[in-house]
């Protein structure tokens, strides 16, 4: 893809650079451009990217499908964090579905036609941003649940969480509008098709704008939000010293560190590519190195589909009990249908948290605080 969020096509050797990908380098001197060949970059990408995309697809699909099945089967009355986690799993799955298309496109060329070019690119961008936004929503939920459990508890209703989830999808859809409008197939050379955006005579401006948008909405603002929310949560945990405080602090730190490690290298590379296109610095050799870096760091960033759901889901004792119930049901069914139901019932009963249960993590502290302030919907249901 071009300057949208979609995976970047490999560099080519012609000088038609203004409307093409991040991998092109816009030289003022056309002679210098022609001397900057990127055959090695293209060869590397044709091997590395399809293999890495396939690995991410298999691992991410397995983990997110498991998460989705557990949430749908065992969490009929979902709290805010579980609604966000469910949407995160859906977002990741839709994101992962696009990777085989890009892998085939890199290894060969775009063979899926113009309609799928536009649709896959749009689907990619929507779920690229929605996945990051839902992670931020989960951080906000934990912040309200632990730091402001009493005064802001009315903000943490299922209706409001569904509303916020709808807003996230709407914003992500709006961000993908350039894909809907500009992305199309291009034949170059004859018989070889590529799928990327064509911005007409305003290619450079659009590329700079969309990269800035990606750095800001896709990394900087979510990172600052997570640092603020989890630092405040950490202060509360240190002050209250609940059981399991150490584990909860480690979970909070792990979530922030994981987001930074996965996304910072990619966003830094995008920023350096922007400076390169503006000719603030660089030459052909620098351009080649950044092309390699962009392929590698982009692939590392895509690992968030595999790691983020695991980190968030397994930070909750409640979810671990749900997972045990699910695995007991599946394994028990293959071993003995009669024992499967007993195992499922036993695990399901153990998944109910009580006031006497030990707090083992950050999510469990929030659950305990939530029990002290039942939300308005639950009170209405009980009174009815």
From Swiss-Prot:
The chain crosses the membrane at residues 51-71, 93-113, 119-140, 163-183, 218-238, 251-271, 294-314. GO terms for molecular function: C-C chemokine binding; C-C chemokine receptor activity; chemokine receptor activity; scavenger receptor activity. Glycans are attached at residue 19. SUPFAM superfamilies: Family A G protein-coupled receptor-like. Residues 72-92, 141-162, 239-250, 315-384 are cytoplasmic. Atypical chemokine receptor that controls chemokine levels and localization via high-affinity chemokine binding that is uncoupled from classic ligand-driven signal transduction cascades, resulting instead in chemokine sequestration, degradation, or transcytosis. Also known as interceptor (internalizing receptor) or chemokine-scavenging receptor or chemokine decoy receptor. Acts as a receptor for chemokines including CCL2, CCL3, CCL3L1, CCL4, CCL5, CCL7, CCL8, CCL11, CCL13, CCL17, CCL22, CCL23, CCL24, SCYA2/MCP-1, SCY3/MIP-1-alpha, SCYA5/RANTES and SCYA7/MCP-3. This is Atypical chemokine receptor 2.
